[in-house]
Amino acid sequence: MKRIKVLLISVLVVSAAAMAFIVPSCRKSEVSHPKVIVIGFDGMDPRLCQRLMDAGKLPHLDQMRRAGGFRPLGTSIPPQSPVAWASFITGANPGVHGIFDFIHRDPKKQCKPYYSAAKTEGGDEGWDVGDHKLPLTFWPFNHEAPQTVLRRGGTPFWDYLDEAGVPIQVYDLPANYPPSESSHGHMCCLAGMGVPDLLGGYGTYQFFSEETFRVRQEGGGIHNPVILEGNRADLRLTGPKNTYLKKPKASTIPFQLYRHPTEAAARIEIQDRTVALRQGEWSDWIKVEFELGMPSFLPNSHVSGICRFFLQEVRPSFKLYITPINIDPTDPGEQQITEPPEFIDDIAAKLGLFYTAGFQEDHAALTNEVFTDAQFRDQAGHVLEERMNLLDFALDKYEDGLLFFYFSSTDLQAHMFWWDSEEKHPIRSPQEADAYHQAIVDLYTKMDSVVGDIVERYGDEATILVMSDHGFCNFRRQFNLNTWLRENGYLQPKDCRSILNPRKGKMADWEQTRAFGLGLNGLYVNLRDRERDGIVNESDRDALLSEISEKLLAVRDPLTNQPVVATVYRSEEVYTGPFASDAPDLIIGYHRGYRAAWATTLGNVDDEVISDNTSAWSADHCIAADQVPGVVFSNKPIRRTAPSLIDMAPTLLKAFGVTKPDSMVGGSLYEPQAVAEAANP
């Protein structure tokens, strides 16, 4: 597994004997190779593509359909982005790569949740110096520092291409942070979804407002009060924790805010920068440097980040939004976000500063009502503009071999703006729902132009593939699996409010609880000798799962009398491989329009089993896999009748004459699919 050091320092040690061997960045092959270009549009939906092609609004994709082919692309079980992209990367089911949900649980700690794609492992204890504990990473101490570890198992398809000498470029692909190593020097990669911001989260904005009266944190953001005295306020920007302290504490940077006395404008002074903004304006990227205090006999450590300021409102209530603090691409420090590490220097030299965090469109700011719809669309537009610049860089660098480029816009904008039915929208009027769904249509037409530019540039000299990991649908109603389990006697006691959070109320009684829900699609049996407090015998597991599955499939929405659950998957029936035993016992596949309730994803219990989704996050895909397939287009004829994600890696290997490994069970898109194989993708 790939490991990177987190916030290490060299403690005044210089080793004259130290030498480094550096594999050349994206080493060119001495022979020419076929050209294969893959564009990944996260969440691009086949139904919407078909409708827009029929209406003449996606001419370039339609041309690909007619010249080569277009198919729905079978997605992963469940159809969550890290699961799906890991299946694309390995050409295998989740039992091989070990990612089953955004959220996994640690059975040794009963149901403690953790992020499925990466983890930070603690290092050695270090050297006690007053309030500090310092890792001595040099000889003779050789302390191990904390390290971020990629959890994804299996072998990525590009390792086989790298070994064969094929040049590979991969940009922003999810489920690959820290980026996997290139053993032969033919691959360069910029990591995407999973890259943290400088605070260690996955997108923590900071919001300063006169309407906020105390510092508070909510999912995705920190809210800070603004107290103006004579149109001036002294504020602090929160940075990374100083992990050299025995009790880690967040670092901060002071900055001053000056509101114009008469105009809708303000000035911000932070470190050596002055930022002047009018209401509604965004700043450029601003570099900020956080100081991490060290013992007095050592120099302090410094961490560089970047952020943008948005002056949301000057009067009557002052409001300032600051983006999550991203890793500085010109000075990433110990945070490796590219492979090889120096590849980020090439990108930054061309593009300057840009979003590096894995989640770039700030959906949390819209969900938490910090952004309006229009403001979120503007911010998402900044992200897309940067991605277009990055694509230009990638195409200019590309000569032959494999180029993979990923766009998040088609997913994260769709989560907030998709609405393709006459049903009542959770938060918008019918007119607003139509208007913002039109924003998704407009986005698809922009992506169609991207495809057109690439086809025009390379024509028939390259194999060009356009793909997505899953489709999309409305998220109208939410189903609280834990509430249902409680009401049906599987989760105890009858007044249980959470399996994790005592602040919610009565906790689960594990001596009586037989099953619980965690994550977006997972249900776990409280199995003896597996869960720390397990009570269900292995001999009773099968009957219990059959009983729960039958009851879930019978659940109907009292509002519409529609079935809520379309499919209940048994893990042993859909997963094989070394990690299969880590999977949930059941994977709940919801019907379109339904999804797991927000509360149930982290083990909480609502009052109602089924309720309206009232979040701005009004569309989703974490449902039954057959209801939200992705797309695949090609400029070469597709001969596979029922392609799926696990066919993509074999397709790419075949294009370069590389034999697929036994772990890949799919086949090339350009070869016929056997009848039996098509029935069991």
Name each model feature, range by range.
Residues 1-12:
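N-terminal Sec-pathway targeting helices
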Residues 15-32:
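Bacterial Sec-dependent signal peptides at the C-terminal "C-region" and cleavage site
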Residues 27-30, 377-403, 413, 419-466, ...:
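A long, amphipathic alpha-helix that forms part
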Residues 32-34, 41, 55-56, 66-72, ...:
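Secreted, luminal/periplasmic, and some membrane-associated catalytic domains
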Residues 47-51, 146-147, 638:
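Second-shell loop/turn segments in exported
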Residues 127-141, 419-438, 606-613:
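A solvent-exposed, charged loop/short amphipathic helix patch at secondary-structure junctions
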Residues 332-346, 389-404:
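Short amphipathic alpha-helices and their capping/turn segments at secondary-structure boundaries
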Residues 593-642:
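Low-complexity, glycine/alanine/valine/leucine- and proline-rich hydrophobic stretches
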